[in-house]
Structures are given as structure tokens and as C-alpha cells.
């Protein structure tokens, strides 16, 4: 919206700065962060009153989690509110990538909200039917992937390789849908400790903001020999808003958390990162930048698969952050060490931009 005022620079000195993606990205960060920080306390109070007992605690989980009883969930509403308002204020409202990404984020958030609602009202850790939930997620992701295919190419870029793309054809749609749904649920699995998921999400958002900016600039894309995608640079503004909202949310989600993100936030943010990786043609790089989420998901797959084969467990509990809880690590140790892993993996992912 503010981009409109840049056309009035002859009458309003200084508004020309609104043309620059870098300026609007920083402005989006500050705006979303301020929104979440200022309105967070009232939202938390409202959710606490409405939810009563708060998010139910798993009976088979670590004993230390029972002290979290009564903590409200659906904190993703705070994040999504800040992101949407900030993105609409500072983003280019004529950019298709912005709208497709918001579409995925909000619909995944709605699915997560319904899941949280069922868990809170029924006081059970079993929410929305798994099959129904996945079906809706794949439907939303497929629609978004189809739209991106209409405005872009069906190519899959490979890191470390110069100017080589695999033409996926119509297979681009199911492949992209799997990326979006996979990451949405991967972030959801990671969100099991206070502050554990939000910082890696912020790290990934900042990393993909840089990738989107470079991929959307023909000069930088040519220099780095990465796939140029016209208009995708606008996603840097949206991802900047995610980073800012994440900072605001971390203020309340830091141990001991005053509120949990819930499926409302984790599904929405994971789905958003997934569709951004598709739009920027960096789906494979997502494996590195979102590496912590991948590791958490793999731990669940390994645990379930091995148990079905041998009736034995590889980990004391999955996802893997619970394994370390059972090993005696404190929650703060796990969270901070996993943050470090997320940052290192993101740096490795960003290094692929130059290593070709």
C-alpha cells in the first residue's frame, strides 16, 4: 500500500524511498514486530480466559511439561495478524507471489486453528482427523502451486550446479505441494518446547528474504548464476514481516512461555516457507535452510518405521527434542543448541548461492 505513495515523490519529498524493497522489508519487520509486541498482552489475556485449561499436555510426554498446564495456545493468531497487516501495508498489492503466499499462510493457519480449537475444547491431544487435515493441506498447496506454474517455469534448480534445471512439467504441482505440506508439518513437529520453533522460522525467513531479493533482481541473479524470477523479490517484504512478528512473539514465547504458537502458527509459517521456496526455485536449498525441521521430521519417520519393523525404538521419544529431554538435558539447553544448529544449517544453505 505504501508503495503507492512513491509515485507522488514530486509533491511529497522523501516518499521515493518506498520504491525500494530493502526499505520496505525493514519497515515491515518493525511494523509487524510492534503490532505483536503491543497487542500481544491483550490477545494472551483473551485467549487465556476463553480457553480455560489451555493446551492439553500429553500424558506420555516428559514430566517437566506438566508445569506448563494452563498455558494458552493459538499464539499463531498474534503472528499472522502482525504479518498480514504489515505485508498489506508495505507490500506491492499487485504482486501475484505476495497474494499466493498469503493464501497458503492463511489457509494453513485456518486448518491449524481448527485443530487447536478441537484440542482445547475437547481437552485432548487428538485434534483434526489426520487424513482430512492432510487432504485440505494438499488441496491448498496444489492450488498455490498451479498458480505459480502459470506465471513461472516448471523447472527445478539444483544447488552447486550452474544454469541447470530439471523440467518437471506438470509434475511440478504435486512436487511443490509435497514441499509445502511437508514443511508445514515439519515446523509443526518442531514446535514442542518454549521458543524452539519460532527462532528457526525467523532464521529461515531472513535467509529466504535474501534469496527472494537476489532471485528477483536480474543483475544479482545473473552474477550468482541462480534462476531469475521476475517479481519474486517482493516476498522479501513478506518474510521481513514474518521475522519482525517472530521477534515480537518470542518476547512472550521465551521460557517460561506465556503462550504457545499452536498449530495455528506452526502450520501457517511452515506452509509459507514452503511456498516461498517453490516460488524462488530453491526447494532443494530449503533442505539446508530448514534443516532443523527436516531433522525433527526424520526422527519421527525413523522412530515409527523402526518400531513397526522391530518393535524397538531408536530414540527415547520422538521428535528428537523430546529424546534429549529424556536424556536429562534442560529445556533451555535443547532450545539454544537447536537454535545454533538452525543457524549453522541456514548459513550452509546460503553458501550454495555462491558455490557453483
From Swiss-Prot:
TM stretches of this protein: 25-45, 70-90, 93-113, 138-158, 164-184, 195-215, 232-252, 258-278, 284-304, 333-353
Subcellular location: Cell inner membrane
Top-level taxonomic group: Bacteria
Gene Ontology biological process terms from the UniProt entry: cell division; cell wall organization; peptidoglycan biosynthetic process; regulation of cell shape
EC number: 2.7.8.13
Entry keyword Magnesium: yes
Keyword Phosphoprotein set for record: no
Catalytic activity: UDP-N-acetyl-alpha-D-muramoyl-L-alanyl-gamma-D-glutamyl-meso-2,6-diaminopimeloyl-D-alanyl-D-alanine + di-trans,octa-cis-undecaprenyl phosphate = di-trans,octa-cis-undecaprenyl diphospho-N-acetyl-alpha-D-muramoyl-L-alanyl-D-glutamyl-meso-2,6-diaminopimeloyl-D-alanyl-D-alanine + UMP
Stored InterPro entries: Glycosyl_transferase_4 (IPR000715), PNAcMuramoyl-5peptid_Trfase (IPR003524), PNAcMuramoyl-5peptid_Trfase_CS (IPR018480)
Pathway, per record: Cell wall biogenesis; peptidoglycan biosynthesis
Function field: Catalyzes the initial step of the lipid cycle reactions in the biosynthesis of the cell wall peptidoglycan: transfers peptidoglycan precursor phospho-MurNAc-pentapeptide from UDP-MurNAc-pentapeptide onto the lipid carrier undecaprenyl phosphate, yielding undecaprenyl-pyrophosphoryl-MurNAc-pentapeptide, known as lipid I.
Similarity annotation: Belongs to the glycosyltransferase 4 family. MraY subfamily.
Listed name of the protein: Phospho-N-acetylmuramoyl-pentapeptide-transferase
Species of origin: Bartonella bacilliformis (strain ATCC 35685 / KC583 / Herrer 020/F12,63)
Gene that this polypeptide is encoded by: mraY
Amino acid at each position: 500500500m505504501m508503495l503507492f505513495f512513491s509515485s507522488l515523490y514530486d509533491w511529497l519529498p522523501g516518499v521515493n524511498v518506498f520504491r525500494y524493497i530493502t526499505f520496505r522489508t525493514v519497515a515491515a519487520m518493525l511494523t509487524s514486530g510492534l503490532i505483536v509486541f503491543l497487542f500481544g498482552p491483550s490477545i494472551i489475556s483473551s485467549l487465556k480466559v476463553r480457553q480455560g485449561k489451555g493446551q492439553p499436555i500429553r500424558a506420555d510426554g516428559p514430566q517437566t511439561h506438566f508445569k506448563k498446564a494452563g498455558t494458552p495456545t493459538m499464539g499463531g493468531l498474534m503472528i499472522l495478524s502482525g504479518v498480514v497487516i504489515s505485508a498489506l501495508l508495505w507490500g506491492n498489492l499487485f504482486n501475484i507471489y505476495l497474494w499466493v503466499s498469503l493464501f497458503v499462510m492463511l489457509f494453513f493457519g485456518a486448518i491449524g486453528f481448527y485443530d487447536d480449537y478441537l484440542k482445547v475444547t475437547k481437552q485432548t491431544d487428538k485434534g483434526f482427523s489426520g487424513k482430512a487435515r492432510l487432504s485440505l493441506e494438499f488441496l491448498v498447496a496444489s492450488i498455490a502451486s498451479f498458480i505459480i506454474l502459470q506465471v513461472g517455469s516448471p523447472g527445478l534448480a539444483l544447488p552447486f550446479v550452474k544454469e541447470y534445471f530439471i523440467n518437471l512439467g506438470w509434475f511440478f504441482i504435486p512436487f511443490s505441494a509435497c514441499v509445502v505440506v511437508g514443511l508445514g508439518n515439519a515446523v509443526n513437529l518442531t514446535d514442542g518446547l518454549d521458543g524452539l520453533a519460532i527462532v528457526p522460522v525467523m532464521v529461515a525467513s531472513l535467509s529466504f528474504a535474501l534469496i527472494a531479493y537476489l532471485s528477483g533482481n536480474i543483475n544479482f541473479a545473473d552474477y550468482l548464476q541462480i534462476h531469475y524470477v521476475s517479481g519474486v523479490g517482493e516476498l522479501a517484504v513478506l518474510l521481513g514481516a514474518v521475522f519482525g512478528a517472530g521477534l515480537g512473539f518470542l518476547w512472550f514465547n521465551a521460557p517460561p512461555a506465556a503462550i504457545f504458537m499452536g498449530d495455528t502458527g506452526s502450520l501457517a509459517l511452515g506452509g509459507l516457507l514452503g511456498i516461498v521456496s517453490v516460488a524462488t526455485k530453491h526447494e532443494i536449498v530449503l533442505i539446508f535452510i530448514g534443516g532443523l525441521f527436516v531433522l525433527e521430521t526424520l526422527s519421527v519417520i525413523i522412530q515409527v518405521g523402526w518400531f513397526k519393523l522391530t518393535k524397538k525404538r531408536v530414540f527415547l521419544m520422538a521428535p528428537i527434542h523430546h529424546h534429549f529431554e529424556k536424556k536429562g538435558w534442560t529445556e533451555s539447553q535443547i532450545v539454544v543448541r537447536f537454535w545454533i544448529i538452525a543457524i549453522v544449517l541456514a548459513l550452509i544453505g546460503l553458501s550454495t548461492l555462491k558455490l557453483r
